[in-house]
């Protein structure tokens, strides 16, 4: 998705610029619009539209970032040059725009802190307090071998994440690992652990290779559509941090 970490809240208000440019060829998204038939698609904008209208987009168009209300057809999902994030069909375009504004307003400070951690070469474990500042629910970031890269929790509200480790190791206990692996084989979404704990899974891949998974446990607050959008956004940003200079202390990656 181009709905990634180069977008700031201010970008959606028409102000260009971002704190992290790992690729000089990458430009910021500069606006969020409700799609209307007949308009000329513009690059680097987010278009909000119903799934049934995707077929009406001209065959020749710039690279587009779309929020589809309802699940698109397989043909649309595979169409080149269209990055699509689809959401539940009960949402209206106006609700999506409102969610986007809230999302990026909430995300701005989070992104700046991620940027700082990246530039300081901090390990993934340094993410824990940053994640807690954005997500009320416990969140677990795991690597390709189901090792725990980051663990965020409010100990006053929940101790479940404390019990997710396999003994005193840095790996998930088998029951959590099995549940998370099943969720990561597909596109993620809402699932639950063998203990019956609901969670939201967002797998992050590069060229079909699983890099890591983000798991938000629903133990303090119900999972929301905003959580899903924000986790997708966060996952792609963390992937870009890996590409720049984020150090994974477990796997011994070196600064690039």
Show which residues each predicted segment covers.
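Alpha-helical/coil-rich non-catalytic "connector" segments in signaling and regulatory proteins
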Residues: 1-254
């Amino acid at each position: 998705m181009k709905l990634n970490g180069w977008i700031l809240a201010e970008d959606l208000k028409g102000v260009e610029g971002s704190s992290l440019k790992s690729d000089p060829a990458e430009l910021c998204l500069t606006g969020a619009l409700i799609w209307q038939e007949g308009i000329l698609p513009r690059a680097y904008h987010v278009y909000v539209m119903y799934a049934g209208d995707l077929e009406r987009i001209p065959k020749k168009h710039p690279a587009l970032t779309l929020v589809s209300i309802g699940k698109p057809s397989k043909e649309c999902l595979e169409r080149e040059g269209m990055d699509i994030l689809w959401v539940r069909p009960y949402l209206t375009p106006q609700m999506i725009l409102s969610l986007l504004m809230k999302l990026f307003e909430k995300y701005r400070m989070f992104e700046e802190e991620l940027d700082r951690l990246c530039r300081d070469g901090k390990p993934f474990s340094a993410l824990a307090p940053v994640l807690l500042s954005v997500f009320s629910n416990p969140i677990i970031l795991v690597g390709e071998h189901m090792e725990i890269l980051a663990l965020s929790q409010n100990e006053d509200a929940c101790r479940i994440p404390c019990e997710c480790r396999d003994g005193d190791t840095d790996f998930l206990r088998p029951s959590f690992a099995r549940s998370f692996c099943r969720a990561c084989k597909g596109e993620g979404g809402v699932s639950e652990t063998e203990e019956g704990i609901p969670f939201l899974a967002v797998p992050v891949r590069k060229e079909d290779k699983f890099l890591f998974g983000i798991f938000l446990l629903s133990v303090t607050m119900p999972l929301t559509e905003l959580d899903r959008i924000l986790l997708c956004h966060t996952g792609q940003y963390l992937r870009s941090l890996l590409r720049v200079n984020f150090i994974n202390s477990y796997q011994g990656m070196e600064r690039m």
